[in-house]
Curated annotation (Swiss-Prot):
This is Aspartyl/glutamyl-tRNA(Asn/Gln) amidotransferase subunit B. The keyword Acetylation does not apply. Keywords: ATP-binding, Ligase, Nucleotide-binding, Protein biosynthesis. The keyword DNA damage does not apply. GO terms for molecular function: asparaginyl-tRNA synthase (glutamine-hydrolyzing) activity; ATP binding; glutaminyl-tRNA synthase (glutamine-hydrolyzing) activity. It catalyses: L-glutamyl-tRNA(Gln) + L-glutamine + ATP + H2O = L-glutaminyl-tRNA(Gln) + L-glutamate + ADP + phosphate + H(+); L-aspartyl-tRNA(Asn) + L-glutamine + ATP + H2O = L-asparaginyl-tRNA(Asn) + L-glutamate + ADP + phosphate + 2 H(+). It comes from Natronomonas pharaonis (strain ATCC 35678 / DSM 2160 / CIP 103997 / JCM 8858 / NBRC 14720 / NCIMB 2260 / Gabara). Signal peptide: none annotated. Allows the formation of correctly charged Asn-tRNA(Asn) or Gln-tRNA(Gln) through the transamidation of misacylated Asp-tRNA(Asn) or Glu-tRNA(Gln) in organisms which lack either or both of asparaginyl-tRNA or glutaminyl-tRNA synthetases. The reaction takes place in the presence of glutamine and ATP through an activated phospho-Asp-tRNA(Asn) or phospho-Glu-tRNA(Gln).
Length: 496
């Protein structure tokens, strides 16, 4: 694209993704080494001759990895072929002990598919080109700086051989924000399927291909013809490990390329590294083409007939379907249903609570009160899964009018999360049981007698006066009176 063209027309980003998902299996994809990583483990201790690529070591395919891949394919509406095969992808890099990677080439385990998601309240659908199984390389630690400034680099092969599913999208994204929304939705689906651990470091990594085209080449539905795509030089951005990181990296790269085009410079076709600490991409190497990898069949792994058992693999209810069911079955609004299905653990927790209490009451407590307090403490629902009975008891105390909603929210729930105490003990220790009617009535009378100015303001029509008097009663009763009852008693006495 010439500088003149760039000045006359706006520019549009074209983005495609390669999403690498670490599958949740007990052992690596081609050997019996554990995948259970420990933050304190020594480097190069979860290895064997197979994952180190030593001569004579033969790979054995992990059935669990295949099952997980089939589940993902079904969730993405992919075609699961009758037969799938493995190939060797040849390249030289320090984290690849064999100097080739066992992956899939012309017969991936998942072919085609799509994923629908929302961005800025607009529904988008991105096509999935394929998803294939492969082994994860080792990991590199760049000492003394980032990849382009490090004094030296250390290699750890503990990760080598961890099962990966690489999900390749069509170049259907037109902004970094769309990419972030897509990754959030994909993560949600994968978590519901139970095929990966979202809390594990590096469990989802992204390589993104980005190029810039003239906006006039983009059709009304966002389509771009093949010739335009082929003519545009693209960069591959690596080292993206989060949804937020993907948005930041691609926003930077889009700006960098647009600036280059607008200044009449050619965009180099290269591989770039996202340096999160500096917020920039840096050049790594010229971008390889498919022919550079010299793919050939992996002779040590025979073709796999997935058709023999793929129909036996079921997938659970997915987030969109569960969201819709919550709205229909429990009468929830869209926002609340979305909160309650944000993760499978939250949805499961809510349904167990809703089995005991009115669904609307359970929804309010889980979606608004509990999730809000957990988020404030940087906790997850999984941190309290074993305390479901205690949480149910708290709702029961409110439902049976034994404590006020205010005390339940602001005292009991917070102490439960901070100190680990059961609700009954907190109520007893803090004397939070509801004040009896006579005591509330006495506190109402005292508030009126002791605050004549507020009474005068109330009769003058000032709205804040009643709230002040309610506050005085609540203070007198230690917050154990019901605010609604106090309000009614005050109005009755003031208006009588």
């Amino acid at each position: 694209m010439t500088a003149q063209t760039a000045e006359e027309h706006s520019l549009t980003a074209v983005i495609g993704l390669e999403v690498h998902v670490q599958l949740e299996t007990d052992t690596k994809i081609f050997c019996g080494c554990s995948t259970d990583a420990d933050d304190n483990e020594e480097p190069n201790t979860r290895t064997c001759p197979v994952c180190l690529g030593l001569p004579g070591a033969l790979p054995v395919l992990n059935e669990g990895a295949v099952e997980a891949a089939v589940k993902v394919g079904k969730a993405l509406s992919s075609d699961i072929p009758e037969e799938t095969r493995f190939h060797r992808k040849n390249y030289y890099y320090p984290d690849l002990p064999k100097n080739f990677q066992i992956t899939q080439y012309d017969a991936p385990i998942c072919d085609g598919g799509e994923l629908e998601f929302a961005v800025d309240d607009e529904r988008r659908t991105v096509a999935i080109e394929r998803a294939h199984l492969e082994e994860d390389p080792g990991s590199l630690s760049h000492a003394g700086g980032s990849i382009d400034t490090a004094e030296h680099t250390l290699v750890d092969y503990n990760r080598a051989g961890t099962p990966l599913l690489e999900i390749v999208t069509a170049p259907d994204f037109r902004s970094a924000a769309e990419v972030r929304a897509f990754l959030a939705k994909l993560t949600e689906v994968l978590e519901y399927l139970g095929v990966f651990d979202v809390t594990r470091d590096g469990s989802l990594r992204v390589d993104a291909n980005l190029s810039i085209v003239d906006s006039d080449a983009v059709g009304e539905n966002g389509s771009i013809d093949e010739a335009t795509l082929e003519a545009a030089n693209r960069t591959e951005v690596k080292n993206i490990s989060s949804h937020k990181g993907a948005e930041k990296a691609l926003a930077y790269e889009e700006t960098r390329q647009k600036n280059a085009v607008q200044r009449g410079r050619e965009v180099e076709q290269e591989t770039r590294h996202w340096d999160e600490s500096r917020g920039i991409t840096v050049s790594m190497r010229s971008k390889e083409e498919e022919k550079d990898y010299r793919y050939f069949r992996e002779a040590d792994i025979p073709p796999l007939r997935v058709s023999d058992w793929k129909e036996k693999i079921d997938i659970p209810e997915l987030p969109d379907a569960r969201r819709e069911r919550f709205r229909e079955e429990y009468g929830l609004d869209a926002e609340t249903a979305s909160k309650l299905t944000s993760t499978k653990q939250v949805a499961d927790f809510y349904e167990r609570v809703a089995d005991t209490f009115a669904p609307e009451l359970a929804a309010t407590w889980v979606a608004d009160n509990l999730l809000g307090e957990l988020n404030y403490r940087d906790m997850e629902i999984t941190d309290i899964e074993g305390r479901l009975d205690e949480f149910a008891h708290l709702i029961e105390l409110v439902d049976e009018d034994e404590i006020t909603v205010k005390n339940a929210e602001e005292v009991v729930l917070r102490r439960m999360l901070d100190d680990g105490q059961p609700p009954g003990d907190i109520v007893e220790a803090e004397d939070l049981g509801k004040t009896d009617d006579d005591a509330v009535a006495a506190a109402v009378t005292a508030a009126i007698e002791e605050n004549p100015d507020a009474v005068e303001d109330y009769h003058a029509g000032e709205d804040g006066a009643l709230n002040f008097l309610v506050g005085q009663v609540m203070q007198e009763t230690g917050g154990s009176a019901d605010p609604g009852t106090v309000n009614e008693l005050l109005r009755a006495e003031l208006d009588g």
